[in-house]
C-alpha cells in the first residue's frame, strides 16, 4: 500500500522571526561610528507582527545627519531577510529615538552632572561672527529636539543678551543658583545680564576666571544634551579656565575666508590641541554676500576656511553667507527667524547636524581628559 505522506514543498514560506530581524540589523552600520547597530546597542525593538516588521533605533543625537541612510539600510536588510524566509512584508516601520551619550571614558566626575556634552565655540580673533555661529548652532540643535544650553563666556564683550533678545528679561536667583533664561528653545546665561548694560568690565585675569567659573557652575542648567560655550576671542584666560574646569567633548573653530582670520584660526586650533581638546571642525562665516542682482560677491575671499580645514586635516562644517536678514535677526534678538530664509536655514541646519555627528564620534571614542597645562 502506497504511503499517504506528502513531503512539504522545499520552497514553502517560513515565518520571519524577531531573532532573524536582529541578525539582519547586525549588517547595518552607523556611518559615523563605523560599527553595526546591534553592537552599538542602538536597537531597542525588533518585532515581527504578522506582515509588519517593527523596529526602533536609538540614535546618538536627535540631529543625526545620516538618519535617512540608516533607515534605507535597515529596510534593505530586513527585506533581504524576509525574502530569504519567503515571508511577505507589507510594511517595515522604523522609529527613531535619540539619547545623547556621555563619553565612554572620563577622568573624574563632571562638575555639571546633568550636562552630557560640552562644546566650545572659539576663534583666534574677534569680529568673525563667533557668537552668531554659537547662537545658531544652539538653536539648530534644539530645533532637532535636543536639550541645549548656551553659556556666554565672553566676559569682556557679552553679546548674547542682544542676540537672544534678553533685554527685558530679569535675572532670577534661587539660593546660590542662577536660573537660566529660556528663549528660542534653549537655556542661556550671560555676564551681560548680571552687570549694568553699559558697564565696562575692567578686570584682570583672575577676576575673569572667577566670573566665568561662577556662570558655569552656579547656573541651574538641569538636564542638557549639549552645553554650547561661546568663548571670547584669542587664547587667554577664559579658554584656559574652561579647559581646566569642564570636561570638553570638543571645540568648533570659526573663521572667515580672509587670510588674516585663517592665521588666527590656526592658532586657535593649536591652542585647543595643546589643551587636549578635540577640534570637531572649522566653520566659515561671512562666506559670501548675495546682492539684489542675485550674484554672489566674495567680500573676504573665497573658500579660505575650507582650505584651512583641509590643510590641518580637520572636518569642514560648512559655510554661512552674509545676509541682511541675519544681521537684522541678530540685532533684534530673534535667531529663530533665520530658519525662514532658505539659504540660512540650509547653512545652519547643515552646521548643526554635522557638528552633532562629530560630537557623537568624539563621545564614542571617549578620549578626552582634563588637561595638564604646559608652556612650550
For the regions a protein language model found, what residue spans apply to each?
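Phosphate-binding loop that captures ATP/GTP phosphates
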Residues: 141-203, 209-217
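Conserved Switch II/interswitch segment of TRAFAC-class P-loop GTPases
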Residues: 222-226, 247-268
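Extreme N-terminal, non-catalytic leader segments
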Residues: 39-42, 47-53, 60-122, 352, ...
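Phosphate-binding/switch loop-helix module in NTP-utilizing enzymes
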Residues: 195-242, 261
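C-terminal lobe/tail of nucleotide-utilizing enzymes
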Residues: 81-82, 95-97, 102-103, 269-376
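N-proximal, solvent-exposed amphipathic alpha-helical segments enriched in charged/polar residues
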Residues: 2-44, 76, 80
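Walker A/P-loop phosphate-binding motif and the immediately C-terminal alpha-helix
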Residues: 118-154, 265, 269
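Residue-level signature of catalytic and energy-coupling elements of molecular machines
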Residues: 25, 43, 64, 78, ...
